[in-house]
Amino acid sequence: LLLVGHGNVPLGSGLSSSSALTCCSALSFLTIMKIPVDKVKLAAQVAKSEATVAVEGGGMDQAVSLNAVRGQVSVINFNPLRFNQIKLPDGVVVAVFSSLKDSKKATGDCNFYNTRVAECRAGCALLLKKAGKWDNKVHMCLDVQQLLGKRSPSGMLAEVDGLPEKLTLQQLQVELGFESLHEMLQKLFSTQSGGVLIENAAESTQLTINSRLRHVYSEGFRAQMFERVLQTQSGDEEDRLATLSKIEELMNDSHTSCDIDYECSCKELNEVVAEAKKCGCFCARLTGAGMGGFAVGLVHAQEAHTFFEKMKGYYVRKGVKNVEEVLFLTEAGEGASEIVL
């Protein structure tokens, strides 16, 4: 079977170019073979493919790539994977703009991406140890929230406050009761591809714990609030503006948390987010894994042209020749589909 691919999603952009490729390949194969497609199940299966290049991804990119609905915000929940589609407020345009720095999870900055996963696993283990529920197994943040009986991610923030900000691997090993560093690496930090999350691990290797989990749980709470705000829209103009004001606060707080607590932003992303706000975006945040790539923001429809022209000038001053490759206005689009010719 020979598949020929073509796409216009910039590589290293943080706009799910890798997920677009894997989702398209899988859907094409199933269509050609006349195999019935369950896109929810397919999203979970495709998400596992990134583990073959030693990146411990989640599954959100694949889920939305296959199941998005035009004009709707996709609220994605896991364990099990399920969707809730909610309409964006009227009069809003989505702006997407580049930091002019590539974000490549599988090369270079991959270390930071997998290290964040390791730091979260370590924090989860410490939370369970404190609660007397540690069983020497890998647990995700949602697992811990459920095991501790917290209905909302916000309920975890007080628990996180008791965690140390930083620990060396040796200190973590002693705290969790592993007999050796090797045992801990294999049991707590192994990857699906058979490797370990932390390259060149040594007893003195330091992990950041408190800030990472504070970001994860506060971000989960922001996502819940975003969903709630959209669900309670009444449709009148006063309510629309109030909704946008709440969205503005949530998205801006999200970028700040990504930058300060999770440290997945960078000076280039922070610069372009700040510039976008100067040019008319009322809210913006990085998208994708971070450490470069693109950011996404919202613009009032009546101000979209002015915003675009101002941002275009910014990129021209940066020496960008093909501005259409680094800046575009769009809307929530449809997920993957097949057309049989």
Label every model-predicted segment.
Residues L1-G5, L269, A284:
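A short glycine-rich, hydrophobically flanked beta-strand micro-motif that places a catalytic Asp/Glu
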Residues S13-S19, D261-E263, R285:
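Short helix-coil transition sites and intra-membrane helix breaks within transmembrane domains
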Residues V75-C283, G297-L341:
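C-terminal nucleotide
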